[in-house]
Amino acid sequence: MQIFVADKSQLTVIRDLAYKIWPDAYGEILSEAQLDYMLENFYAIPALEKQMEMGHVFLLAEENDVFYGFASYEVNCKSTGKTKLHKIYVLTETQGKGVGKLLLSAVEKAAIKASNSHVFLNVNRYNNAQEFYKRLGFEIIHQEDIEIGQGYLMEDFVMEKPL
C-alpha cells in the first residue's frame, strides 16, 4: 500500500472516493438531502481546488492502481502549532485492514516534521469513527456545532492527540 500526496490531477479520484464512502459513513446519521448538500459543497472539484489553495494537503492510499482511501490535513492550522486532520476516509470494504492507520501515520509524520505539537480533528458526534480515533490516542477536548448553510449543522466533537 502506498500513501502519497495527491496533486490537482487526482482530485477526481478524491471526489469519486467521497461519493462512494459518504453514503456508508453518514447514511444513518445525516438526511439524504444534507448528505447531497455536503458532497456537492465540499467535494466538487472547485471546492477541492480551493482547499488545496488554502494549504490543505491531500493524501491518497493506493495499491496496484486501486485507490482505497484519502486524507487531507493542514500543518500549523490557524497558526496554532497544531496540525488539523480535515478528512480521512477509507472504502467500507477495506476498513479494519490498516489503511486508515497508514493515512493517519503519514499525517502525524508531516505534523512532526513541521514541529507541530498535536493533531486535532472534528468528528460527527454520532459517527462510529470516534472509536477509531480513540484507539489511536485521540481524546475528546470539546464539542461544537458548525452551521454550513441551508439550515444544516455539523454536530461535532473536537478530538486531539499529542505528538
Indicate residue ranges for each PLM-predicted region.
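Conserved catalytic-core motifs of GNAT/GCN5-like acyltransferases
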Residues: 120-124, 134, 139-157
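Extreme N-terminal starter segment of soluble prokaryotic enzymes
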Residues: 1-3
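Short polybasic/polar patches that bind polyanions
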Residues: 95, 112, 134
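Acetyl-CoA-dependent GNAT
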Residues: 5-11, 15-93, 104-106, 110, ...
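Active-site acidic-Proline motif in GNAT/NAT acetyltransferases
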Residues: 91-97, 125
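Helix-turn-helix
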Residues: 129
